[in-house]
């Protein structure tokens, strides 16, 4: 048996595996931030009862022990994500970088920064450890670390083939696949080729998430938006941009050379995917949860 697509730290030593490791992913992102000159790193948006977040938190604490010139601190929440954001805000002057466990938390934090007048990346660098569509289309776009599931699949086959050839039932082989840092605007990189993401399956092994992560209203809204974006093509993204710009449906049809029925079909699909029932509800979702400016419909 070769276990895959589960955090290596969760897999019993009796099993062979080819998969990702949250500990290694955390260390990779910390390496990237330290190389950029970051010295005071806050890990924000950690659920107190999330085993995944505990792994990230412990990985940072242990890794930064090797770098006496760098400091790290963690900000948790018990019921609502803004508990963590507010705790960080009270101590914000002590940090130059914020690292979030995933793109949902990071986009929510960018929205929080806008409300508090914090300009990213001028005042603060922000990055996250899971890449999602919402992180590419917010503004500033999010520097993130993507798991290469194609590489995991390839290595799983290689491990299986090796075990078949080895023929020893007691032999075990474990491979942890590194992620890939995608630098974007939130750490000072201009949007360009780096905006492309490796294929991601959403929330990875979400069954390990504890606490209120999946019930927090703001994070739920962002997950609905993520599902919407995963179903969008380039034309849909341009429609979203024009909707946010306040264009009337007739003007959208004219600009995009769409017939009324085609536009109606696409708009309904967008609203349904975002779990909204009307244009007003969709706009409200965007205004209340996403960044004020976006990259929807822009050339990458």
Briefly describe each language-model feature range:
Residues 1-237, 241-250, 254-260, 264-272, ...:
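Bacterial carbohydrate/catabolite-sensing allosteric modules
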């Amino acid at each position: 048996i070769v276990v895959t697509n589960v955090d290596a730290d969760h897999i019993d030593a009796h099993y062979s595996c080819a998969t990702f490791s949250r500990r290694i992913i955390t260390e990779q992102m910390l390496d990237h931030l330290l190389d950029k000159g970051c010295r005071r790193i806050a890990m924000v948006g950690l659920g107190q009862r999330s085993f995944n977040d505990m792994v990230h938190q412990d990985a940072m604490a242990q890794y930064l022990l090797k770098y006496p010139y760098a400091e790290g601190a963690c900000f948790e929440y018990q019921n609502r994500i803004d508990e963590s954001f507010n705790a960080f805000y009270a101590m914000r002057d002590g940090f130059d970088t914020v690292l979030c466990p995933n793109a949902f938390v990071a986009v929510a934090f960018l929205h929080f920064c806008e409300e508090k007048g914090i300009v990213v990346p001028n005042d603060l660098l922000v990055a996250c450890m899971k890449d999602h569509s919402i992180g590419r289309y917010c503004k500033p776009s999010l520097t993130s670390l993507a798991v290469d599931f194609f590489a995991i699949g390839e290595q799983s086959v290689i491990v299986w083939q090796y075990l078949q050839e080895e023929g020893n039932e007691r032999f075990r082989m474990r491979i942890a696949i590194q992620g890939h840092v995608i630098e974007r605007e939130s750490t000072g990189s201009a949007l360009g080729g780096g905006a492309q993401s490796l294929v991601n399956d959403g929330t990875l092994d979400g069954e390990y998430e504890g606490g209120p992560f999946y019930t927090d209203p703001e994070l739920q809204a962002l997950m609905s938006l993520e599902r919407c974006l995963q179903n969008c093509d380039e034309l849909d993204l341009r429609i979203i941009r024009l909707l946010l710009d306040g264009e009337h449906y007739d003007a959208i049809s004219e600009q995009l050379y769409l017939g009324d029925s085609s536009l109606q079909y696409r708009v309904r699909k967008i609203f349904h995917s975002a779990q909204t029932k009307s244009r007003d509800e969709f706009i409200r979702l965007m205004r209340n949860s996403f960044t004020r400016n976006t990259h929807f419909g822009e050339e990458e």
